[in-house]
UniProtKB/Swiss-Prot annotation:
It is an enzyme of class 7 (translocase). NDH shuttles electrons from NAD(P)H:plastoquinone, via FMN and iron-sulfur (Fe-S) centers, to quinones in the photosynthetic chain and possibly in a chloroplast respiratory chain. The immediate electron acceptor for the enzyme in this species is believed to be plastoquinone. Couples the redox reaction to proton translocation, and thus conserves the redox energy in a proton gradient. This is NAD(P)H-quinone oxidoreductase subunit J, chloroplastic. Belongs to the complex I 30 kDa subunit family. InterPro entries: NADH_DH_suC (IPR010218), NADH_quin_OxRdtase_su_C/D-like (IPR037232), NADH_UbQ_OxRdtase_30kDa_su (IPR001268), NADH_UbQ_OxRdtase_CS (IPR020396). NDH is composed of at least 16 different subunits, 5 of which are encoded in the nucleus. It is found in: Plastid, Chloroplast thylakoid membrane. The keyword Cell membrane does not apply.
Length: 195
């Protein structure tokens, strides 16, 4: 390198563009992720089918997030299965805030042999802390079996219609729901007391 050459602080992509030009800025990313007024393909289709839901925007990977009420979950889930979302990739739950609502979350994928990037959608069902009940989707996607049981075991969400809803990680006589934010951990628990 010669003394009078300026060293560039930027990096070039394989196309020769500066990395800053090729990569979306944080502000443009935030606009897509946080703008709840933008409806995605799945939300538009559900609206055409007159199925109640609320668009919540997109996650950081561009996956559409929809809120569904517990009483509408079965009809929306069946419609999405018919639309082609044939795989429940993940079902989980979380505690929104101490003393607040719980959420049951469903990550659905549209698997097709001809597609490199399968379409995905995320459903969220918010439930009251006292007596959180939601229909099981086990009858639509069998992969919900152990996942709904884990959500029941850790958060106390009751999945109505699940064929074998019981604790899966904790002993049957465990008191409370360990992953709730207001859960008080016991001082000790002896395993021999569980059997």
């Amino acid at each position: 390198m010669k003394n009078n050459e300026k060293v560039s602080d930027s990096f070039l992509t394989s196309s020769g563009k500066e990395l800053s030009e090729a990569t979306p800025s944080a502000s443009s990313y935030t606009t897509v992720v946080r703008d709840k007024n933008i409806k995605g393909v799945v939300s538009n289709w559900l609206a055409e089918m007159k199925l109640r839901h609320k668009p919540l925007g997109f996650d950081y990977q561009g996956v559409e997030i929809l809120e569904v009420k517990p009483e509408d979950l079965t009809s929306v889930a069946i419609a999405l299965y018919a639309y082609g979302f044939n795989y429940l990739r993940n079902q989980c739950a979380y505690d929104v805030s101490p003393g607040g609502n719980l959420a049951s979350v469903y990550h659905l994928t549209k698997l097709d042999a001809d597609v490199d990037q399968p379409q995905e959608v995320c459903l969220k069902v918010f439930l009251p802390r006292e007596n959180p009940r939601v229909p099981s989707v086990f009858w639509i996607w069998k992969t919900a079996d152990f996942q709904e049981r884990e959500s029941y075991d850790m958060f106390g969400i009751y999945y109505e219609g699940h064929p074998h809803l019981k604790r899966i990680l904790m002993p049957e006589n465990w008191v409370g729901w360990p992953l709730r934010k207001d859960y008080i951990t016991p001082d000790f628990f002896e395993l021999q007391d569980a059997y």
